[in-house]
Amino acid sequence: MDLELRGKAAIVTGGSRGIGKAIAHELAREGASVAIAARGREALEATAAEISDETDMPVTPIVADTAREDSVRDMVSRAVDVLGGVDILVNSAAEVGSRVAFPLPEIDVEVFRGELNVKVLGALRCIQHVAPHMIRRGWGRIINISGMNARNAGSVIGSARNVALVAMTKNIADELGPHGINVTVVHPGLTLTERYHAQAEATAAERGVPLETVINERFGANVLGRPMTAIDVAYVVTFLASPKATAINGDVIAVAGGYPRAIYY
């Protein structure tokens, strides 16, 4: 299937590592020109060079912090200058650590506020700055990366920020839909990224068991019985970013391998 992404311009926040990196790679592989944004310059530039070398597509690294209005404004401005516009926005930036289930007395309000600022308000800032460009073109795709803890209790911070992102997405989808702009949410499950792979290696060494054992125990608790990887998420996001996904708007897509005994409707 030709996803018709050649010639499209995309911004991927949180694009230097993990799921964001995989998404940027797939978009470039399908022919999109991509700008990736993150706070760490070294990893960002290395990722941009790697993706560009592997896809023969231009990848622009932009140091940016979605928690800051001025940084987001400058990021979008530079991306538009370099790419000639913005057709696709993937909001993948997030603070690490929201999966930790702190007891109620130990929840740090400042940490909570920081996570909301980066992920939820950060996504809002990015959307506010790219939407006018998409409206002028009469076409756009915005994909917000949330997470399965929007559907499951266990982390107050993680659940709250992801539910907020879902609610915001639906409201914005209703507003931007008449302009030809689709806005969706993707819920990755526990995904075996570089960071989690390193953690699994440390756990395996500590327990004296094979790495595969730890990975299957921690990441294979889905119906498929295998870990979800960043590329699994990237395939779905890349489709949602394409003209082929016109019928999907304001909706949530889970990429978690299927949670046992759960029914979502």
Please state what every model-predicted region is.
Residues 63-75, 109:
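The beta1-alpha1 cofactor-binding region of Rossmann-like NAD(H)/NADP(H)-dependent oxidoreductases
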Residues 95-96, 109, 141-165, 169-178, ...:
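Catalytic loop of short-chain dehydrogenase/reductase
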Residues 100-104, 108-113, 142, 218:
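Substrate-binding pocket helix/loop in short-chain dehydrogenase/reductase
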Residues 127-128, 170:
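A short, exposed helix-loop element centered on a Lys and neighboring polar residues
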